């Protein structure tokens, strides 16, 4: 086993890999509780109960899809990179697709399933490099930052810190109410933990927020901690049962968004974590195709089980910092996700006010790369800015992407740089124009 995972070559050991895998798990364990709450639109109180996805099934699907993704990454690509349903992508699934477009969660899972199959095909061919090179780096960065702003807004809104206002659209909520104060407490605690660089700061912040909520009667006290694994029956297989529902221009945009965000989120995370671990060779990632295949395969598995798009987690960097260097650490993380399926009773503790701090803080982390955008170049700065700002303002990640991708060819052509725009970008320009003409 040491030979397979190249322990000697990488200068690692079982101890380092186990500690690294555990550290990564604790750093991203929050997704087990945030994902069900998000996909079920728990913060939207007037959403019909009959149309909500089952939280228990999503919890199990999240754990199993994460376990499968981590183990595949460890075995196929042999990288210490963990996989789980992506923050931002789950918000797009719930708030943009289900709530905003009125698409059923079953059809949305079908969209995730198809995007995963396309991702698998791209991972097996050389076309993936063409896709990566087609999208300008400024737009890639803007999409990530825009999603960060979006999920931060979702967290602020769902917790009651921001509420609706007929004159100004939004305003600050009742900051004297218990639930809002609990969220503010959670944000402060989590920020302090992150500033102090405490491993698993987001997860620990959620735990402390939940405990504070129980002390002051704002969060129900669980009757048990360990219980039976929630059934997958409500969600399992819905992705392929509802495949006939995907044949529309609206669903095409949804699938493209799932594919685009998932693809570039994964590519960026792989490079970032591999660079930190010293695994890059001549500025290239060895076995990149295998890593993308592991990631894309987990998307298909997750959709069938009943969760939104999975992706490589940048929190894997915490495991690398703790000593992880090989795929063995990812397998350790995967096994821990399997064990986590028995902790479903804790879902009752994780209210929208407990998860809101995680959304707000993770959103802030996603905005960090904005400094890499050439803001002094107006032809790329404007499309990037519009991509980013229109996501929270229109409450739609897809709309933000569409607007940015429409403006980019326009500004580049006006600047006399038409030849620098990849043909794929012109194709997307036409697709998104048709999207606004016929669907908006």
From Swiss-Prot:
GO terms for molecular function: purine nucleobase transmembrane transporter activity. The keyword Transport applies. The chain crosses the membrane at residues 18-38, 57-77, 81-101, 107-127, 142-162, 175-195, 201-221, 251-271, 291-311, 327-347, 354-374, 388-408, 419-439. InterPro entries: Azg-like (IPR045018), Azg-like_bact_archaea (IPR026033), NCS2 (IPR006043). One of its GO terms (cellular component) is plasma membrane. Induction: Expression is regulated by both purR and xptR regulons. Negatively regulated by hypoxanthine and guanine. It is found in: Cell membrane. Disruption phenotype: Cells lacking this gene show normal growth on inosine as the purine source, normal hypoxanthine-guanine phosphoribosyltransferase activity, and are resistant to azaguanine. It is a multi-pass membrane protein. It holds the Pfam family Xan_ur_permease. Keywords: Cell membrane, Membrane, Transmembrane, Transmembrane helix, Transport. Belongs to the nucleobase:cation symporter-2 (NCS2) (TC 2.A.40) family. Azg-like subfamily. Involved in the uptake of the purine bases hypoxanthine and guanine. This is Guanine/hypoxanthine permease PbuG. It comes from Bacillus subtilis (strain 168).
């Amino acid at each position: 086993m040491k030979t397979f995972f190249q322990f000697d070559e990488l200068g690692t050991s079982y101890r380092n890999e186990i500690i690294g895998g555990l550290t990564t798990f604790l750093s991203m364990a929050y997704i087990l509780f945030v994902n069900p709450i998000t996909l079920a639109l728990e913060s939207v109180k007037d959403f019909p109960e009959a149309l909500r996805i089952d939280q228990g099934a999503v919890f199990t699907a999240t754990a199993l899809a994460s376990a499968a993704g981590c183990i595949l990454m460890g075995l196929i690509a042999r990288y210490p990179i963990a996989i789980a349903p992506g923050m931002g992508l789950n918000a797009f699934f719930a708030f943009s697709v289900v709530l905003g477009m009125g698409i059923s969660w079953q059809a949305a899972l079908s969209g995730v399933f198809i995007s995963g199959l396309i991702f698998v095909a791209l991972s097996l061919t050389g076309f993936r490099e063409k896709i990566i090179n087609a999208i300008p780096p400024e737009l890639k960065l803007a999409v990530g930052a825009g999603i960060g702003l979006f999920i931060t807004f979702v967290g602020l809104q769902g917790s009651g810190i921001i509420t609706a206002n007929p004159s100004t659209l939004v305003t600050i909520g009742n900051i004297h109410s218990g639930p809002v104060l609990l969220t503010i407490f959670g944000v402060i605690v989590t920020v302090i933990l992150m500033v102090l660089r405490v491993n698993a700061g987001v997860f620990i912040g959620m735990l402390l927020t939940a405990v504070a909520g129980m002390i002051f009667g704002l969060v129900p006290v669980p009757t048990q901690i360990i219980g039976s694994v929630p059934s997958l029956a409500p969600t399992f297989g819905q992705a392929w049962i509802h495949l006939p529902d995907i044949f529309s221009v609206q669903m095409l945009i949804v699938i493209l968004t799932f594919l685009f965000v998932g693809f570039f989120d994964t590519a960026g995370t792989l490079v970032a974590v591999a660079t930190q671990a010293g695994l890059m060779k001549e500025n290239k990632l060895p076995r990149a195709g295998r890593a993308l295949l592991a990631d894309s395969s987990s998307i298909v598995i997750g959709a069938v089980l009943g969760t939104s798009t999975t992706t490589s987690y940048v929190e894997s960097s915490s495991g690398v910092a703790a000593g992880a260097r090989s795929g063995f650490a990812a397998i350790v993380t995967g096994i821990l996700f399997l064990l986590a399926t028995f902790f479903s009773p804790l879902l009752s503790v994780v209210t929208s006010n407990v998860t809101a701090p995680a959304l707000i803080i993770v959103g802030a982390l996603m905005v960090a790369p904005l400094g890499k955008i050439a803001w002094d170049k107006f032809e790329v700065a404007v499309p990037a800015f519009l991509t980013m700002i229109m996501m929270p303002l229109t409450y739609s990640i897809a709309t933000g992407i569409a607007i940015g991708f429409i403006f980019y060819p326009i500004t580049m052509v006006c600047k006399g740089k038409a030849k620098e725009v990849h043909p794929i970008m012109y194709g997307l320009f036409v697709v998104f124009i048709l999207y606004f003409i016929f669907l908006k």
